[in-house]
Amino acid sequence: KAVMDELIPLAQSRPDIKAYVAPYSGTFYYRNISGTKLLSAHSFGIAIDLVYNRKDYWKWASREEGQKRLESYPKEIVEIFEKNNFIWGGKWGHFDLFHFEYRPEIIMMSRFFGNRNNEPQFWYNGAPVDNDEVKSYIKKIDETFENL
C-alpha cells in the first residue's frame, strides 16, 4: 500500500513513469519459478511485475539489450519500492527489470551489514534496534531460526 500511495500520484503526473507502471503485469499468481520446481514469490503474494518489455528479462533479451533498458529504467520507481523493503530484479545477474519482491530481511541486511568485520557479535549488530519495525524483523528472523 505504501508503494502505491507514492507511485500512483507520480505515475499520474509523469507519463514517462506511467509507461513503466500501468498496466502492471501481475501480482499474486500461484506458479513455479521458470525451469524449477520452486514456488515463485508471486505464489506467496509478495511480488509484483510492472509493465514488461521483451528486453526486461534475461531469457528474452541479450545482455546488451538488458543493459540498455536497465540504464533507461526510471530510478524513481526503484527508489520508491526499495524504500518500502522491496528488492528489484534489475539488480540481479539474471535480470528481471519489471519484477519487485517484498523482502524486508534482505533490505535490512544490505542497509546495516554491508561492511562487517569478523568480530563475534549479534547478527543484527549495527541495526537501529530502538526502531519498532526493525525490532519486529529481528524477532521474526530469530523465531524462524529457533523453529528450524
Language model regions located:
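Cell-envelope/glycan interface and biosynthesis
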Residues: 1-92, 126, 143-148
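Conserved beta-strand edge residues that scaffold enzyme active sites
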Residues: 94-96
